[in-house]
Design a protein with these regions (language model features):
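ATP/NTP phosphate-donor binding region
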Residues: 1-19
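Structural motif
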Residues: 22-24, 53, 194-196
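N-terminal glycine-rich "phosphate-gripper" loop used for MgATP/nucleotide binding
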Residues: 24-33, 38, 55
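Feature captures the catalytic cores and cofactor-binding loops of soluble hydro-lyases/lyases
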Residues: 33, 41, 213-218
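Short, acidic/small-residue loops that bind anionic groups at enzyme active sites
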Residues: 39-64, 72-80
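Conserved anion/nucleotide-ligand pocket segment
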Residues: 72-168
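Oxyanion-binding "anion nests"
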Residues: 162-209
Length: 218
Protein backbone atom coordinates (compact mmCIF):
# COMPACT_ATOMS: atom_id res chain seq x y z
CA UNK A 1 0.00 0.00 0.00
CA UNK A 2 2.53 2.51 -1.23
CA UNK A 3 3.79 3.87 -4.54
CA UNK A 4 5.43 1.37 -6.92
CA UNK A 5 8.72 3.21 -6.44
CA UNK A 6 8.62 2.86 -2.65
CA UNK A 7 7.38 -0.75 -2.79
CA UNK A 8 10.25 -1.76 -5.07
CA UNK A 9 12.76 0.04 -2.88
CA UNK A 10 11.36 -1.51 0.31
CA UNK A 11 11.37 -5.03 -1.15
CA UNK A 12 15.02 -4.66 -2.17
CA UNK A 13 15.97 -3.32 1.27
CA UNK A 14 14.07 -6.01 3.16
CA UNK A 15 15.61 -8.74 1.02
CA UNK A 16 19.09 -7.40 1.75
CA UNK A 17 18.40 -6.92 5.47
CA UNK A 18 20.28 -8.99 8.04
CA UNK A 19 17.44 -8.83 10.58
CA UNK A 20 15.14 -11.31 8.81
CA UNK A 21 15.56 -14.79 7.32
CA UNK A 22 12.36 -14.97 5.27
CA UNK A 23 9.88 -12.62 3.62
CA UNK A 24 6.23 -13.73 3.68
CA UNK A 25 3.69 -11.83 1.63
CA UNK A 26 0.50 -10.75 3.38
CA UNK A 27 -1.55 -11.87 0.38
CA UNK A 28 -2.01 -12.01 -3.36
CA UNK A 29 -3.37 -9.00 -5.19
CA UNK A 30 -3.00 -7.04 -8.39
CA UNK A 31 -0.39 -4.92 -10.17
CA UNK A 32 2.74 -6.09 -8.37
CA UNK A 33 4.26 -5.89 -11.85
CA UNK A 34 4.35 -2.10 -11.45
CA UNK A 35 7.06 -2.31 -8.75
CA UNK A 36 9.46 -4.38 -10.86
CA UNK A 37 11.29 -1.44 -12.50
CA UNK A 38 12.12 -0.26 -8.98
CA UNK A 39 13.39 -3.60 -7.63
CA UNK A 40 17.17 -3.80 -7.89
CA UNK A 41 17.65 -7.36 -9.08
CA UNK A 42 21.43 -6.93 -9.20
CA UNK A 43 21.37 -6.28 -5.45
CA UNK A 44 18.87 -9.12 -4.94
CA UNK A 45 21.17 -11.52 -6.79
CA UNK A 46 24.22 -10.38 -4.81
CA UNK A 47 22.45 -10.61 -1.44
CA UNK A 48 22.53 -13.62 0.85
CA UNK A 49 19.70 -15.90 -0.41
CA UNK A 50 16.55 -16.02 1.67
CA UNK A 51 13.09 -17.48 1.25
CA UNK A 52 10.28 -15.39 -0.21
CA UNK A 53 6.86 -16.97 0.30
CA UNK A 54 3.67 -15.99 -1.50
CA UNK A 55 1.30 -16.94 -4.30
CA UNK A 56 -0.77 -15.44 -7.12
CA UNK A 57 0.44 -11.88 -7.86
CA UNK A 58 3.61 -12.66 -5.90
CA UNK A 59 4.65 -14.60 -9.01
CA UNK A 60 6.07 -11.25 -10.12
CA UNK A 61 8.84 -11.78 -7.58
CA UNK A 62 8.96 -15.52 -6.84
CA UNK A 63 9.42 -16.34 -10.54
CA UNK A 64 11.98 -13.63 -11.21
CA UNK A 65 13.84 -14.63 -8.07
CA UNK A 66 14.38 -17.96 -9.87
CA UNK A 67 15.06 -16.80 -13.42
CA UNK A 68 17.00 -13.58 -12.75
CA UNK A 69 18.57 -14.06 -9.30
CA UNK A 70 19.10 -17.84 -9.55
CA UNK A 71 17.57 -18.25 -6.10
CA UNK A 72 14.86 -20.68 -4.97
CA UNK A 73 11.52 -19.33 -3.76
CA UNK A 74 8.37 -20.85 -2.28
CA UNK A 75 5.12 -20.49 -4.20
CA UNK A 76 2.65 -21.05 -1.41
CA UNK A 77 0.35 -19.74 1.25
CA UNK A 78 0.58 -16.16 2.45
CA UNK A 79 0.98 -14.88 6.00
CA UNK A 80 -2.70 -14.73 6.96
CA UNK A 81 -3.22 -18.49 6.68
CA UNK A 82 -0.77 -19.11 9.53
CA UNK A 83 -3.34 -17.56 11.88
CA UNK A 84 -5.44 -20.71 11.40
CA UNK A 85 -6.04 -22.34 14.79
CA UNK A 86 -5.28 -25.91 13.73
CA UNK A 87 -2.78 -25.90 10.91
CA UNK A 88 -3.49 -28.00 7.85
CA UNK A 89 -0.61 -30.30 6.92
CA UNK A 90 0.18 -27.99 4.00
CA UNK A 91 0.93 -25.18 6.45
CA UNK A 92 3.05 -27.48 8.61
CA UNK A 93 5.06 -28.55 5.56
CA UNK A 94 5.51 -24.95 4.42
CA UNK A 95 6.72 -23.78 7.82
CA UNK A 96 9.08 -26.76 8.07
CA UNK A 97 10.59 -25.89 4.69
CA UNK A 98 11.17 -22.30 5.78
CA UNK A 99 12.92 -23.52 8.94
CA UNK A 100 14.82 -26.34 7.25
CA UNK A 101 13.14 -28.87 9.53
CA UNK A 102 13.25 -32.44 8.28
CA UNK A 103 15.51 -31.55 5.36
CA UNK A 104 18.26 -33.89 4.20
CA UNK A 105 21.43 -33.12 2.29
CA UNK A 106 21.79 -35.56 -0.58
CA UNK A 107 25.15 -34.94 -2.25
CA UNK A 108 24.73 -31.18 -2.03
CA UNK A 109 21.02 -31.21 -2.87
CA UNK A 110 18.72 -30.32 0.02
CA UNK A 111 15.64 -32.55 0.04
CA UNK A 112 12.40 -32.30 1.97
CA UNK A 113 9.43 -34.66 1.63
CA UNK A 114 6.06 -32.93 1.78
CA UNK A 115 2.51 -34.25 1.78
CA UNK A 116 -0.22 -34.09 -0.81
CA UNK A 117 -3.91 -33.64 -0.07
CA UNK A 118 -6.88 -35.63 -1.34
CA UNK A 119 -9.23 -32.64 -1.16
CA UNK A 120 -9.23 -28.93 -1.97
CA UNK A 121 -11.14 -25.77 -1.19
CA UNK A 122 -13.55 -24.22 -3.70
CA UNK A 123 -15.18 -21.62 -1.43
CA UNK A 124 -13.39 -20.13 1.57
CA UNK A 125 -15.24 -19.67 4.87
CA UNK A 126 -13.31 -16.45 5.53
CA UNK A 127 -15.33 -13.44 6.69
CA UNK A 128 -14.92 -10.40 8.95
CA UNK A 129 -15.78 -12.40 12.06
CA UNK A 130 -13.56 -15.33 11.08
CA UNK A 131 -10.56 -14.04 9.08
CA UNK A 132 -8.50 -17.24 9.46
CA UNK A 133 -10.86 -20.24 9.19
CA UNK A 134 -9.90 -23.85 8.61
CA UNK A 135 -9.69 -24.81 4.96
CA UNK A 136 -13.13 -25.70 3.56
CA UNK A 137 -12.05 -28.95 1.88
CA UNK A 138 -15.18 -29.96 0.02
CA UNK A 139 -13.77 -31.01 -3.36
CA UNK A 140 -11.98 -34.23 -4.25
CA UNK A 141 -8.61 -33.97 -5.95
CA UNK A 142 -8.46 -35.59 -9.39
CA UNK A 143 -5.07 -36.02 -11.05
CA UNK A 144 -4.85 -36.82 -14.75
CA UNK A 145 -1.55 -37.80 -16.36
CA UNK A 146 -0.60 -37.23 -19.98
CA UNK A 147 2.40 -38.21 -22.05
CA UNK A 148 2.31 -35.93 -25.05
CA UNK A 149 -1.36 -35.71 -25.92
CA UNK A 150 -2.26 -39.14 -24.61
CA UNK A 151 -3.69 -39.80 -21.17
CA UNK A 152 -2.07 -42.68 -19.31
CA UNK A 153 -2.70 -44.55 -16.08
CA UNK A 154 0.85 -45.75 -15.37
CA UNK A 155 3.28 -44.37 -12.81
CA UNK A 156 5.31 -41.44 -14.12
CA UNK A 157 8.60 -40.27 -12.64
CA UNK A 158 10.51 -37.14 -13.63
CA UNK A 159 12.88 -34.62 -12.11
CA UNK A 160 14.14 -31.12 -12.84
CA UNK A 161 13.98 -27.53 -11.68
CA UNK A 162 10.45 -26.60 -10.62
CA UNK A 163 9.47 -23.11 -11.80
CA UNK A 164 6.22 -21.35 -12.57
CA UNK A 165 3.38 -19.59 -10.82
CA UNK A 166 0.26 -17.68 -11.77
CA UNK A 167 -0.22 -17.75 -15.52
CA UNK A 168 -1.91 -14.33 -15.50
CA UNK A 169 1.38 -12.86 -14.25
CA UNK A 170 3.68 -15.04 -16.35
CA UNK A 171 2.08 -14.12 -19.66
CA UNK A 172 2.20 -10.46 -18.62
CA UNK A 173 5.97 -10.76 -18.06
CA UNK A 174 6.52 -12.53 -21.38
CA UNK A 175 8.56 -10.43 -23.79
CA UNK A 176 9.41 -7.72 -21.26
CA UNK A 177 12.87 -6.76 -20.06
CA UNK A 178 12.23 -9.04 -17.07
CA UNK A 179 11.72 -12.11 -19.26
CA UNK A 180 14.91 -14.15 -18.80
CA UNK A 181 13.29 -17.54 -19.33
CA UNK A 182 15.29 -18.46 -22.44
CA UNK A 183 18.56 -17.82 -20.62
CA UNK A 184 17.35 -19.76 -17.58
CA UNK A 185 16.25 -22.70 -19.72
CA UNK A 186 19.60 -22.76 -21.53
CA UNK A 187 21.54 -22.48 -18.27
CA UNK A 188 19.78 -25.48 -16.76
CA UNK A 189 19.01 -27.50 -19.88
CA UNK A 190 20.85 -30.52 -18.47
CA UNK A 191 18.74 -30.43 -15.30
CA UNK A 192 15.42 -30.16 -17.12
CA UNK A 193 12.60 -27.72 -16.35
CA UNK A 194 9.31 -28.72 -14.70
CA UNK A 195 6.60 -26.07 -15.11
CA UNK A 196 3.77 -25.56 -12.64
CA UNK A 197 0.99 -23.23 -13.75
CA UNK A 198 -2.23 -22.00 -12.20
CA UNK A 199 -4.75 -19.48 -13.44
CA UNK A 200 -6.60 -16.78 -11.51
CA UNK A 201 -8.84 -14.74 -13.83
CA UNK A 202 -8.23 -16.40 -17.20
CA UNK A 203 -11.05 -18.34 -18.84
CA UNK A 204 -10.45 -21.50 -20.89
CA UNK A 205 -9.67 -19.66 -24.12
CA UNK A 206 -7.47 -17.09 -22.38
CA UNK A 207 -5.51 -19.97 -20.85
CA UNK A 208 -4.98 -21.49 -24.30
CA UNK A 209 -3.87 -18.13 -25.70
CA UNK A 210 -1.50 -17.66 -22.76
CA UNK A 211 -0.01 -21.13 -23.26
CA UNK A 212 0.43 -20.43 -26.97
CA UNK A 213 2.09 -17.08 -26.31
CA UNK A 214 4.48 -18.41 -23.68
CA UNK A 215 5.37 -21.42 -25.83
CA UNK A 216 6.15 -19.29 -28.88
CA UNK A 217 8.11 -16.81 -26.79
CA UNK A 218 10.41 -19.62 -25.69
Amino acid sequence: SNTPQECGKELTQMYESNVNDVLISCGGGELMCEILPYVDFDRIKAAKPKWYLGYSDNTNFTFLQNTIADTASVYGTCAGAFAMKDWHQALVDTFDVLRGKGCKNNNGVVEKQVHGSDTWERESLKNEENPAPQYNLTEKKILRKYVGGDECDTEIAFEGRLVGGCMDCLVNLTGTSFDKVKEFNERYADDGIIWFLESCDLNVFAIRRAMWQMDNAG
